[in-house]
Amino acid sequence: MDIIICKDEQEVGKAAAALIAPFATKGGTLGLATGSSPLSTYQELIRMYEAGEVSFKNCKAFLLDEYVGLTRDDENSYFKTIRKEFTDHIDIVDEEVYSPDGANPDPYEAAAEYEAKIAAESVDVQILGIGGNGHIAFNEPSSSLSGLTKVQALHPKTVEDNARFFNTIEEVPTHALTQGLGTLSRAQNIVLVATGEGKADAIRGTVEGPVTASCPGSILQMHNNATIIVDEAAASKLENADHYRLMEQLKLR
């Protein structure tokens, strides 16, 4: 696991984009996350695309998750969100951006179908954020560390947190389709980004805590090619922060 500590959110985005861009140029398969954490990364990748530094025209992309009951064109679907925040601004083919089928009346069937589709591909680089409690995608604490794509009932706090995107809290879906931690772990490379003091406990658990379902992010300690990129605030509770900075400086380029 590589730990990169950056000055601020913008620098986090630049560092993450620099790792991801070579895979895009090669026409790789990307794993995309939504939420606030990867926004600076997407903004930097868009800037690089507009500057002619990278192309996504031969890429495929898989989203982490989707609300059960929402169509892809629903304004609150994650597929719609990733289009607004990223894929509509680059040259990736829209039909090559895949997400779980939240509109399938049988969500368990949708989960199995999405798992099979991902298994048929090899995700070259997976972009991840992390929740304040260490959750990745909708894999909350106590999720199986080897779990596959599944239907996940949303924690009441998650419903409350996401209510700001809907007209009323009653409109927030109560379930989501999400890649499991076992699914995510099959990605060839993982880049997790986190910023802000609110993520400091989760980053400490992910990097320096035991590998445990109590902190889903800790599964990345078992991955051969995981990179954690954080700002100073998110790194503020790491006991070995100075060591990580030194290791990054001494890395052979």
Swiss-Prot record:
Protein keywords: Carbohydrate metabolism, Hydrolase
InterPro entries: Glc/Gal-6P_isomerase (IPR006148), Glucosamine6P_isomerase (IPR004547), NagB/RpiA_transferase-like (IPR037171)
UniProt GO molecular function: glucosamine-6-phosphate deaminase activity; identical protein binding
GO BP, one annotated term: glucosamine catabolic process
Key word Translocase present: no
EC number: 3.5.99.6
Active-site residues, as the UniProt record annotates them: 65 (proton acceptor), 133 (for ring-opening step), 135 (proton acceptor), 140 (for ring-opening step)
Family membership noted in the UniProt record: Belongs to the glucosamine/galactosamine-6-phosphate isomerase family. NagB subfamily.
Name the record gives this protein: Glucosamine-6-phosphate deaminase
Annotated organism of origin: Corynebacterium glutamicum (strain R)
Gene: nagB
